[in-house]
Every structure is written in C-alpha cells, then in structure tokens.
C-alpha cells in the first residue's frame, strides 16, 4: 500500500532475542583437539616403559647382567604429569558436554563465568605438570654434571623418545587450553558489557 502512495517502505526488526543461542563451534572444536592432545599425552606417558639388560661386571669370562626397567612411576614429576593431563582431559570432556547440552540450563550467565574460572585453573594446573615433566626430561636427557646425576636417555632411548612425544602432545594441549581460556573470558566480557 505504501508503494502505491509513493511512500517509502519501512522495515521493522524484532528486538526479541533468538530462543536458541548459537553454539560457538570454534571454542568447541578447540576443546575437542585439546582433549585429544591431553588424553594422548596421558596415555603415552602412562604406558611408557622400557626394560633393558645391561652388563655390570665380568667375572672371568662370564658377564654379570642385570635387568633395569624405566617407568614413569619412578619419577614423581612424571606421575604428576599423568595425573594433571588426565584431569585436563576429563575437564575438557566435561565442558564439551556442558557446551553442547548446557545452554538450556544456564542461569544468568553463571555457566560461562564458572567455565572461565575453571579454564584458568585447568590451564595453570596443566602448565605446572608440563614444567615439572620438562625439567625431569631434560635432566634425563643431559644429566647434571654438577650434582653428578647421570643421564639415562643414552641407555633408554625408546623410553625417552616416547616421553618426548607425550610432552609435545601435552604442550599442544596447553597452548590450546590457553587459547580457549582467552576466548571464553572474552566471550564472558562481551556478554557482560552494557
């Protein structure tokens, strides 16, 4: 009718919010990759074991051998590493479920605030586990001549290589946790901006 009279058409937009909030697929996909990285770091280190027979002495012409086993349980830093990465994996899996199912149960943005706080705590925990394990890995690879600690990676190469793979996977997970943490805090700040 307005076009027949020569008047301009006016379009009105509804200020009613969308009843279904959009899922943030970037954060969700980063969480999935972080879950796989921390879970693989946990499993690789948890099953990291190498047994090797070594000659320690020779009596006459008979060698005296011993069997040594390198396991992650022998080092408290590696035990902490496995526990921390398992916690980070479980947390990421839990938050993936909350991100998929949780928006319908959100109460005044409490879910996003709680996730942001727990993201920071999980990232800090993962960083401490990675730092402790990296220190012990460096000590195992190079030793410490001042403290007279011998290196072991020349004797247990496969053990050290698998430990290195676990560390790399864990650091990838840590970097992804850092990115997810920054994104979740930014998302929280955008929602609270008036």
UniProtKB/Swiss-Prot annotation:
Q: Which domain of life is it from?
A: Eukaryota
The record ties this protein, via InterPro entries, to: CASP/CASPL, CASP_dom, CASPL
Q: Tell me the membrane topology, using the record's own terms.
A: Multi-pass membrane protein
Entry keyword set: Cell membrane, Membrane, Transmembrane, Transmembrane helix
* Location in or out of the cell: Cell membrane
Q: Which GO terms describe its cellular component?
A: plasma membrane
Which residue ranges does the entry give as Cytoplasmic-facing topology?
Answer: 1-24, 99-111, 186-194
* Short name of any one Pfam family annotated for the protein: CASP_dom
Q: Write out the topological domains of type Extracellular.
A: 46-77, 133-164
Where exactly are the transmembrane stretches of this chain? 25-45, 78-98, 112-132, 165-185
Q: How does it assemble?
A: Homodimer and heterodimers.
State the family it belongs to.
Belongs to the Casparian strip membrane proteins (CASP) family.
Could you identify this protein by its name?
A: CASP-like protein 1B1
Q: Which organism is it from?
A: Glycine max (Soybean)
């Amino acid at each position: 009718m307005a076009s027949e009279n020569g008047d301009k058409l006016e379009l009105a937009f509804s200020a009613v919010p969308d009843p279904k909030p959009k899922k943030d697929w970037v954060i969700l996909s980063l969480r999935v990759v972080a879950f796989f990285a921390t879970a693989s770091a946990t499993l690789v280190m948890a099953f990291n074991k190498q047994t090797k027979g070594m000659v320690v002495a020779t009596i006459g012409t008979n060698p005296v051998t011993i069997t040594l086993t390198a396991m992650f349980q022998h080092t408290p830093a590696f035990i902490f590493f496995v526990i921390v990465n398992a916690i980070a994996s479980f947390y990421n899996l839990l938050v993936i479920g909350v991100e998929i199912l949780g928006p319908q149960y959100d109460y005044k943005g409490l879910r996003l605030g709680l996730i942001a706080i727990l993201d920071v705590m999980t990232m800090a925990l993962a960083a401490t586990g990675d730092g402790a394990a990296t220190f012990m890995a460096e000590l195992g690879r190079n030793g410490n001549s001042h403290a007279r600690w011998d290196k072991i990676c020349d004797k247990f190469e496969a053990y050290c290589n698998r430990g290195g793979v676990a560390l790399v996977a864990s650091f990838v997970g840590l970097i992804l946790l850092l990115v997810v943490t920054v994104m979740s805090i930014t998302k929280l700040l955008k929602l609270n901006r008036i």
